[in-house]
């Protein structure tokens, strides 16, 4: 692995500047801030990748309310890459160049079982309000449920208002909340009234991305990622941080 790191560093790290990594926080277990600094799946992975490129790394938190706005920071130089549990979609591929996917996951549904004991999944949402974060890939899924008259409406929260959305499940601000399974599993741990009632609503490939046309950095990150996949590092990080709500891409 050390030899691999040296090769990758020599070929992929032309810059001696820190690798600036954009991420939308809080989004545990992918990334979250603690009193001791940032932690999470993406945080640990990018620390490893930066080391293999012989570069320091710097976390640049994205402050916008719409997740899709994060990609503009690549073009304006705010950061060199994004590692933020980002699903690879055709629309996003027009805004950034994605490396090979590192994780496959899917949307899940959370409810307050004391308010809605009979809701066991998306099939039981008729007449109910679904909460989503603005720009999250759950938003078009929820919109489709409403369009098909399988739910009443969608309530859109700013991206950093996830805890408000979860509080609203109990207060009545919304009836269900949709988000990737590792994230919902993390948040319900300390909220005994909330339960993840359905997983696997979608199948989504997640990946790191760079600004359009930055093939040198994309190749360097891709090679480092492939080495970390082969030596068991990424599978170990998935098990450690993401649990059963995520898996290796096949």
Where are these regions (language model features)?
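Extracytoplasmic small-molecule ligand-binding "clamshell" domains
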Residues: 14-85, 94, 231
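A conserved helix-loop-strand patch within extracytoplasmic ligand-binding domains
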Residues: 55, 63, 86-90, 94, ...
């Amino acid at each position: 692995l050390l030899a691999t790191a040296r090769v990758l560093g020599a070929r992929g790290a032309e810059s001696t500047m820190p690798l600036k990594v954009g991420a939308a926080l809080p989004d545990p277990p992918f990334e979250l801030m603690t009193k001791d600094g940032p932690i999470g799946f993406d945080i640990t992975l990018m620390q490893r990748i930066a080391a293999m490129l012989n570069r320091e790394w710097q976390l640049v938190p994205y402050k916008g309310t719409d997740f899709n706005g994060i990609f503009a920071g690549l073009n304006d130089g705010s950061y060199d890459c994004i590692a933020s549990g980002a699903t690879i979609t055709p629309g996003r591929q027009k805004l950034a160049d994605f490396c090979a996917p590192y994780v496959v996951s899917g949307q899940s549904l959370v409810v307050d079982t004391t308010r809605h004991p009979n809701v066991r999944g998306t099939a039981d949402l008729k007449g109910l309000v679904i909460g989503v974060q603005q720009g999250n890939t759950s938003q078009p899924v929820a919109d489709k449920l409403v369009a098909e008259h399988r739910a009443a409406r969608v309530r859109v929260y700013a991206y950093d208002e996830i805890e408000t959305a979860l509080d609203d499940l109990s207060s009545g601000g919304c009836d269900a909340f949709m988000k990737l399974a590792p994230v919902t599993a993390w948040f319900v741990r300390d909220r005994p009234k909330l339960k993840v009632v359905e997983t696997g609503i979608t199948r989504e490939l997640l990946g790191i991305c760079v600004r359009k046309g930055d093939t040198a950095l994309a190749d360097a990150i891709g090679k480092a990622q492939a080495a970390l996949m082969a030596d068991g590092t990424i599978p170990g990080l998935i098990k450690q941080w993401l649990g059963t709500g995520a898996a290796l891409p096949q």
